[in-house]
């Protein structure tokens, strides 16, 4: 390969152009850019020339004419080097203040150590570690450079041997990498044994004895000094045979201790033991018999010297049994309580409660939450009258809001909220498109609605809010949310298709929400339209039209031509007038989150419908675990609004995280209040989730064990909005049987991130499913590198079909048998060294070589195996048809009898499907 000019430039700290100029001076005219490469020999020659300024012997003759130019460049280089060194000195001052402070103190010692090492050439001498690993140009150093170097680094004398070693290393042709490694290593000085013992021991030794003063000064100021003096008494008795030469080492200096070589005992540098354990032990033993002065003296201002404290009396702990003996007859228990908390309340041991529940067939731990039934049963078991109190009412900010805003005196008429529901492809979105003069249906993937949408329409000077819900079976929870928020439900039924499963489900949702229902019979423009079929089908569900004596309005419409839509809107407004929908304007806002998502550049975004009050920009809100200040409000067309009044819809930005769809959003007075609500709800939900994972009944235990044997497909699900994520998750959880299931290890709203890829790579055979999102190029590259499969979809049933196919591959294949033929054994021949050969007559189909056979005797299967040989007379054949005789040898079976039947068959494997 060779070495690029740019690599040499990086190593030396020069630009590529400067190195190219130097190379051309040396005679390498082919080198013109930094991307050109040279051989290792040429690279070392260029490196030496830039460092020393001396041309190699080969090129020296050619370059005599360019000496003046070279001098100028060398001067420039030296100027640049001084600038680099100045920067180095500044960096050294900033990054190593500790080393700088300690340098002047240890200067003399270091010089002595270096001089002592000159006499011992065998020892290892290493270079000082520079701040930047850029090699210097070997030019004449100026005074300014020397001064800068002295300021930046501690003054350490470098011996002439070192310079000669460096030059010889370059002469030997060391590589650039090895040279830079040497320069990165720090200064290591191995201490030769020297008579410094007297100076060290003089410093360490202290006066022999001194009486301990028992005043405050002895306790606070001189305690450590006295203890050290006492310690030295004991140390005198011990004879130090080894480790006499102890040398202080500045541990704070920037040195690599791994580079210090300890070859023998002579050159060993002994580190002082800095631990305080022996001092602490001695202190305990010495001060054990002394009176406790500190306790008495700490509260006195004067006269603390001669006082002696009385020994404190031992406090006898109260027996715990006394509290257990208390008989509790009645108690209030919170609705959500853990087992150990319940045990504390009724003065029982947790183990006692666990055993009671185990006897009742419920396996629990002390951290599990107890439900109301379990609490009542335990109350009966322990003969305690238990009253269950809902302490979580404090977390119910909606209830607090409703109690504070009961005054309806200032209520005004509000905008009606209409939800359009029905079966998939019956024309719900097309109807809304005609009303709004828009083209939403064309924009939806697959022509089906997969999001909940809220839209404002004005009719006869009055506003109407419409909610469009998906009709696909996967979006049940979306339809349920739409029915809960709405005032009136329009159920769309196709005149040519009649009542379908989702039609029935929509009617049930509307009845559960106790809201008026209007039936819109769509697609009346089709020739196959049959409205009577629709009416009779709905009559079976107790939805009887007004003309048949019922109470439900039926309107025949066409979303394509617009027929009957005006009549439908008139009926909607009439129904709204009958309901007398009212709300207060001048109270804090209360709204319902219809849909939420995470948008790039905007953060968490929520589509809401205000039910009471007025939501304004700048209001502080809380919605479940999400909270924040409303920064932006947009309508369904993207236009910015200042506020949203009751019954109106809008999109808000500013929440801390993506809220759950269906959550109630409340406007609160302060950010602190919102944060506290969100934090408490989050902690409560988390604890309940953790409790769920540990609870299991004895009946469920066997199912859990069996689940361990089930093959699972781990998936990570990411979607554009919360509603779609719910739908995908619920659909995937339904895809299971006794053999396989889907294991959702992570799900979330937003794009596929690198963290998702990392999590998928950590799980075996995990795939990432994206709904209405696309991964970025970086994420795709990382997924390809780690072998993670990412699949994205726009239509939910395509996603479900693909996952079904993958699960089918995990299932054991379905093996089916194909009968080929049957033969009757007429004669059995024993052949030496081979075994039995059956002389057969083929009675049905054919006998084939390679096929499986089974031997049947009197209707009972005696053996299953393979055909080892098949002959007709003396010839080997592949197949013998019906009506012909043949000889059959069966592999591994020698118990054939005349009258047995040989049945030939093949096994066919088919991929199982859910």
Swiss-Prot record:
One of its GO terms (molecular function) is translation initiation factor activity. The keyword Translocase does not apply. The keyword Nucleotide-binding applies. Residues 413-582 form the tr-type G domain. This is Translation initiation factor IF-2. Residues 468-471 are annotated as: G3. Residues 558-560 are annotated as: G5. Its main location: cytoplasm. One of the essential components for the initiation of protein synthesis. Protects formylmethionyl-tRNA from spontaneous hydrolysis and promotes its binding to the 30S ribosomal subunits. Also involved in the hydrolysis of GTP during the formation of the 70S ribosomal complex. GTP binds at residues 422-429, 468-472, 522-525.
């Amino acid at each position: 390969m060779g070495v690029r000019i740019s690599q040499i430039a990086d190593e030396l700290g020069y630009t590529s152009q400067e190195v190219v100029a130097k190379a051309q001076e040396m005679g390498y005219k082919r080198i013109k850019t930094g991307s050109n490469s040279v051989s290792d020999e040429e690279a070392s020659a260029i490196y030496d020339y830039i460092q020393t300024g001396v041309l190699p012997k080969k090129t020296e003759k050619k370059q005599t004419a360019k000496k003046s130019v070279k001098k100028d460049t060398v001067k420039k280089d030296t100027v640049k080097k001084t600038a680099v060194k100045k920067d180095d000195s500044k960096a050294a001052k900033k990054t190593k203040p500790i080393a700088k402070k300690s340098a002047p103190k240890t200067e003399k010692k270091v010089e002595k150590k270096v001089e002592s090492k000159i006499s011992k050439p065998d020892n290892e001498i290493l270079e000082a570690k520079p701040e930047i690993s850029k090699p210097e140009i070997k030019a004449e150093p100026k005074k300014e450079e020397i001064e800068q170097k002295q300021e930046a680094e501690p003054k350490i004398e470098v011996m002439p041997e070192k310079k000669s070693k460096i030059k010889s290393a370059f002469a030997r042709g060391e590589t650039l990498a090895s040279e830079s490694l040497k320069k990165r290593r720090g200064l290591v000085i191995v201490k030769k044994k020297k008579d410094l013992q007297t100076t060290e021991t003089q410093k360490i030794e202290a006066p022999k004895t001194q009486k301990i003063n028992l005043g405050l000064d002895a306790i606070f100021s001189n305690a450590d000094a006295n203890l050290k003096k006492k310690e030295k008494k004991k140390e005198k008795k011990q004879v130090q045979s080894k480790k006499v030469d102890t040398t202080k080492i500045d541990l704070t200096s920037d040195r690599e201790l791994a580079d210090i070589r300890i070859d023998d005992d002579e050159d060993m540098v002994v580190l002082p033991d800095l631990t305080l354990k022996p001092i602490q032990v001695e202190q305990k033993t010495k001060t054990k018999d002394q009176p406790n002065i500190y306790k008495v003296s700490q509260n006195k201002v004067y006269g603390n010297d001669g006082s002696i404290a009385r020994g404190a009396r031992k406090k006898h702990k109260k027996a715990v049994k006394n509290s257990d003996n208390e008989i509790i007859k009645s108690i209030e228990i919170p609705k959500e309580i853990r087992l150990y908390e319940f045990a504390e309340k009724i003065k029982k041991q947790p183990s006692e409660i666990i055993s009671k529940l185990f006897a009742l067939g419920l396996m629990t731990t002390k951290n599990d939450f107890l439900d109301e039934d379990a609490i009542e049963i335990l109350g009966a078991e322990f003969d305690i009258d238990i009253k269950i109190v809902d302490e979580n009412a404090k977390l119910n900010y909606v209830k607090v809001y409703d109690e504070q805003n009961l005054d309806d005196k200032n209520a005004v008429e509000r905008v009606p909220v209409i939800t359009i529901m029905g079966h998939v492809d019956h024309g719900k979105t097309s109807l809304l498109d005609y009303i709004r003069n828009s083209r939403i249906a064309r924009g939806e993937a697959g022509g089906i609605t997969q999001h909940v949408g809220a839209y404002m329409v004005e009719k006869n000077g009055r506003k109407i809010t419409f909610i469009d819900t998906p009709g696909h079976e996967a979006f049940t929870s979306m339809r349920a949310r739409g029915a809960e928020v709405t005032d009136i439900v329009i159920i769309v039924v196709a005149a040519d298709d009649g009542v379908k499963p989702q039609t029935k489900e929509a009617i049930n949702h509307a009845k559960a929400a106790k809201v008026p229902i209007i039936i819109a019979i769509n697609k009346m423009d089709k020739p196959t339209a049959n409205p009577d079929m629709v009416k009779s089908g709905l009559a079976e569900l107790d939805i009887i039209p007004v003309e048949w004596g019922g109470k439900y309005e039926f309107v025949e419409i066409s979303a394509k031509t617009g027929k009957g839509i005006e009549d439908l809107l008139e009926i909607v407004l009439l129904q709204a007038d009958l309901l007398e929908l009212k709300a207060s304007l001048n109270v804090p806002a209360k709204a319902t989150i219809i849909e939420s998502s995470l948008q790039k550049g905007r953060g968490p975004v929520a589509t809401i419908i205000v039910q009471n009050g007025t939501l304004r920009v700048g209001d502080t809100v809380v919605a479940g675990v999400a909270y924040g200040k409303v920064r932006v409000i947009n309508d369904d067309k993207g236009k910015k609004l200042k506020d949203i009044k009751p019954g109106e819809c809008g999109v808000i930005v500013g929440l801390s995280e993506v809220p759950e769809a269906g959550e109630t959003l409340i406007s609160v007075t302060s950010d602190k209040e919102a944060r506290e609500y969100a934090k408490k709800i989050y902690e409560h939900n988390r604890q309940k989730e953790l409790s769920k994972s540990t609870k299991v009944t004895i009946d469920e235990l066997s199912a859990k064990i069996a689940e361990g044997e089930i093959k699972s497909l781990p998936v990570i699900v990411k979607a554009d909005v919360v509603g779609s994520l719910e739908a995908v998750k619920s659909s995937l959880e339904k895809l299971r049987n006794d053999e396989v299931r889907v294991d959702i290890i992570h799900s979330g709203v937003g794009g596929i991130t690198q963290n998702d890829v990392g999590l998928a790579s950590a799980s075996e055979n995990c795939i990432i499913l994206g709904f209405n999102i696309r991964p970025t190029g970086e994420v795709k590259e990382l997924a390809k590198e780690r072998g993670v499969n990412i699949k994205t979809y726009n239509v939910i049933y395509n996603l479900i079909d693909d996952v079904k196919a993958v699960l089918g591959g995990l299932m054991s294949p379905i093996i089916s048998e194909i009968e080929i033929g049957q033969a009757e054994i007429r004669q059995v021949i024993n052949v030496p060294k081979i075994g039995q050969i059956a002389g057969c007559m083929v009675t049905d189909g054919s006998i084939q070589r390679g096929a499986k056979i089974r031997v049947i005797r009197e209707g009972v299967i005696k053996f299953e195996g393979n055909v080892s040989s098949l002959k007709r007379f003396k010839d080997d054949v592949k197949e013998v048809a019906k009506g012909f005789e043949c000889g059959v040898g069966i592999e591994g079976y020698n118990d054939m009898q005349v009258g047995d039947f040989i049945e030939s068959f093949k096994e066919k494997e088919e991929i199982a499907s859910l």
